[in-house]
Amino acid sequence: MKKFVAFAGFALLSVGAFAQTNLQVFYDFGENRKHVTTTLEMFKSDDWGSTFFFVDYDYFNKDYRNEEVAGVKIHPNTYGARSSYFEIARSLNFWQESSLGALSAHIEFNGGVGFGSRNWLFGAEYFLHNDDFSNTFTFELLYKTFKGSESHLPLQFTFVWGMNNLLGVEGLKFSGFADIWGEDTYLWADRDKCESSLTFISEPQLWYNVGQFFNCPNLSAGGEVELSYNFAYNEGFMVNPCLGLKWDF
């Protein structure tokens, strides 16, 4: 799950229409993971707000090809995408030049293949930044609907941050997000509902623009750490480190 570029792009809202797209390729070193994930992100601003989406694909590895799905064994030569997940969001802001320009209305849809729940989210977001927009922070408060799962607390809190040229190092960027919401989810281990309805996920990322040294400023190397609690059918706290490359189009 990624949502970094959407809020980095707010820094350029004041100069008119702006678009940004990037592709990230990760190898996940987490326990029982050991697979490749690709993420395509796009952000575009306009006079009425902004649009953002991302698509994640997780790919088959050796262990996945030994699994059974609905009682059918997966062919050992199966390759390609194993599951996918996407989010698309629209921020509405007709008052960008007013004193409330940092506050936007927000509508979002989450879903995918291999994920039990699909969600519509409605609410508001608030954007903060320093003078040159090199450091940004966004907070969202959203009402969350559930299709395929249930919730006794249908709210989501989202925090997104971006820090460019971290510690004064040109090309070093620290970004990330954290989502907290209520959802009663089933666990793979025992198929019983989790006692806690709180779900948390955060993915801090660190990127360094290695391409600046060989006339290829689009290329960055780095990684992320997925920190989660009661997320994706897993009970308790999990840490999944990843290494990757990113290409900014």
Regions flagged by a language model, labelled:
Residues F237-F249:
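Outer-membrane beta-barrel "beta-signal"
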Residues Y27-E31, Y57-N61, F109-V113, L128, ...:
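Transmembrane beta-strands of outer-membrane beta-barrel pores
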Residues L40, I88, F122-Y126, F157-W161, ...:
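Membrane-embedded beta-strands of outer-membrane beta-barrel proteins
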Residues A19-D63:
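Short glycine/proline- and aromatic-enriched beta-strand/turn motifs that initiate or cap beta-hairpins
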